[in-house]
């Protein structure tokens, strides 16, 4: 382990070149016009002061706030298989303050690095995928960290569809045709829509589990995610319980 740490941290090697070769090989094996690019964050529990970007933040692995490092990852999936294709370390904003100056030097943090939110890091990676043209894809999927970010969604490539999780307290406008009347109504939370007795649910197979199919009730409702009435703000809201 120590030898690997020395190799990764002290020896000179072209990380960008290795990552580029990895993408080329994955693309050669997996790329497909109907491919899916998935965005997610993942954390590693970390203690001490000798590792960059360690902070008291949400750790998805533990489901609670803990000292950890957090990264944003990009995966590619097609009918041919799946693989991770890119990554960015998320550096919390406080790490750029004066009180962290010595720790930045000790951890050899690049001086030109600037703070970026996780959705920004994800957008950068997706834009790089499009720029290189190695991977064909039609879909982008993400969880609430990215689905709740209007900037992330607005900056996605125009040619892709997006399946994004959003928070249950997110407010949207129900499309008038699906309301009892066509008058402009106030926004409602996703959880309130899910509790509405008028919503029709259908039992569907969600996935294949180790002990058989995983079933759940699903529904969909046409909504506006922003200024109601504008066609560009219309979305399908998919519900599951």
What are these regions (language model features)?
Residues 103-182:
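Domain-level cores of phosphate- or acyl-group-handling catalytic modules
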Residues 13, 37-38, 44, 58, ...:
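Bulky hydrophobic/aromatic packing residues
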Residues 4-7, 37-38, 54, 58, ...:
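Long, contiguous hydrophobic alpha-helical segments, chiefly transmembrane helices and signal peptides
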Residues 31-33, 68, 134-136, 156-159, ...:
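Short, well-ordered loop/turn elements at secondary-structure boundaries
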Residues 2-6, 61-137, 234-241:
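Electropositive, glycine- and tryptophan-enriched low-complexity nucleic-acid-binding patches
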Residues 80-107, 111, 165-241:
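An anionic, glycine-rich sequence signature occurring as long contiguous blocks
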Residues 1-49, 128, 163, 181-208:
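Electropositive nucleic-acid engagement tracts
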Residues 12-93, 104, 221-227:
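Active-site-proximal, Lys/Arg-enriched surface segment
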């Amino acid at each position: 382990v120590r030898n690997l740490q020395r190799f990764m941290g002290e020896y000179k090697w072209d990380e960008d070149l290795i990552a580029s070769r990895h993408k080329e090989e994955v693309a050669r094996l997996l790329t497909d016009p109907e491919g899916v690019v998935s965005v997610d964050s993942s954390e590693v529990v970390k203690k001490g002061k000798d590792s960059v970007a360690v902070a008291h933040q949400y750790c998805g692995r533990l489901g609670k706030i803990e000292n950890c490092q957090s990264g944003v990852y990009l995966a590619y999936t097609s009918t041919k298989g799946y693989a991770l294709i890119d990554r960015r370390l998320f550096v919390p904003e406080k790490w750029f303050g004066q009180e962290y100056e010595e720790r930045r030097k000790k951890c050899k943090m690049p001086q030109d690095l600037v703070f970026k939110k996780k959705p920004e890091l994800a957008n950068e990676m997706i834009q790089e995928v499009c720029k290189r043209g190695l991977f064909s894809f039609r879909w982008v999927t993400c969880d609430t960290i990215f689905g709740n970010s209007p900037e992330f969604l607005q900056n996605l490539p125009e040619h892709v569809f997006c399946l994004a999780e959003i928070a249950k307290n997110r407010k949207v406008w129900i499309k008038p045709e699906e309301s009892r009347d066509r008058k402009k109504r106030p926004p409602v939370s996703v959880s309130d829509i899910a509790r509405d007795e008028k919503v029709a649910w259908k039992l569907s197979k969600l996935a294949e589990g180790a002990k058989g199919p995983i079933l759940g009730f699903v529904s969909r409702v046409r909504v506006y995610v922003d200024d109601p009435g504008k066609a560009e703000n219309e979305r399908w809201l998919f519900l599951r319980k």
